[in-house]
């Protein structure tokens, strides 16, 4: 079943509200099916609207899928927004904890986002890459706050670690009974190890 996030059937909604409702149902549908199995028929039936209305709002099944991925990615970014009032390393720990918790709570959504990176749809890939870029930028700000200097290798290391983290979350958070603390500790240590290779002078800063 898709989620129960829809308004009651035949409720008159504004176009903006209806579009948001259909996307919410699409994101909820990722809980028990992959993105490619998310059909316009199922979503329109759940919302109590015609299939033609789906085409009116999204143009095609692919257009709907793109917007579902965009909304799902935005929801993850909002849920894991760094708390800038925390000291940098505490901020890292808190953000990673909330990321792992999000993945555990929204397995299908996260898996669809990761799989979207390999999608044949260029726009879906761009949406996923955009979310990765936000995660990398957040990490860069955090380490700049610690005094770690920017460089080409620093940027490459952060983006590579984000991809590494995705695989760790799929394999560790979704496919094992590892605790959240165990996964977070592993990710913290791996990130700090990578950065000290890129910038050996950062080791003393990170150890403080």
Identify what each model region corresponds to.
Residues 6-10, 28, 37-39, 47, ...:
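Short glycine/proline-centered loop/turn elements that form peptide/ligand docking sites
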Residues 111-114, 181, 203-204:
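Short, hydrophobic secondary-structure boundary micro-motifs
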Residues 67, 81-107, 145, 157-161, ...:
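Hydrophobic alpha-helical connector segments
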């Amino acid at each position: 079943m898709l989620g129960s996030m829809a308004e009651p059937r035949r409720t008159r909604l504004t176009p903006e509200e209806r579009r948001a409702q259909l996307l919410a149902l699409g994101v909820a549908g990722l809980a028990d099916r992959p993105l490619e199995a998310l059909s316009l028929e199922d979503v329109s039936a759940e919302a109590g609207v015609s299939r033609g209305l789906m085409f009116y709002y999204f143009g095609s099944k692919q257009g709907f899928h793109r917007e579902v991925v965009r909304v799902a990615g935005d929801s993850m970014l909002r849920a894991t927004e760094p708390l800038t009032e925390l000291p940098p390393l505490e901020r890292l720990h808190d953000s990673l904890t909330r990321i792992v918790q999000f993945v555990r709570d929204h397995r299908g959504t996260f898996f669809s986002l990761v799989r979207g990176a390999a999608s044949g749809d260029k726009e879906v890939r761009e949406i996923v890459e955009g979310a990765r870029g936000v995660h990398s930028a957040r990490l860069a700000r955090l380490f700049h706050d610690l005094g770690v200097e920017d460089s080409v290798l620093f940027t490459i290391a952060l983006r590579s670690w984000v991809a590494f983290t995705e695989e760790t979350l799929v394999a560790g958070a979704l496919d094992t009974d590892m605790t959240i603390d165990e996964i977070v500790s592993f990710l913290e240590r791996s990130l700090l190890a990578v950065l000290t290779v890129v910038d050996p002078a950062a080791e003393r800063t990170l150890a403080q």
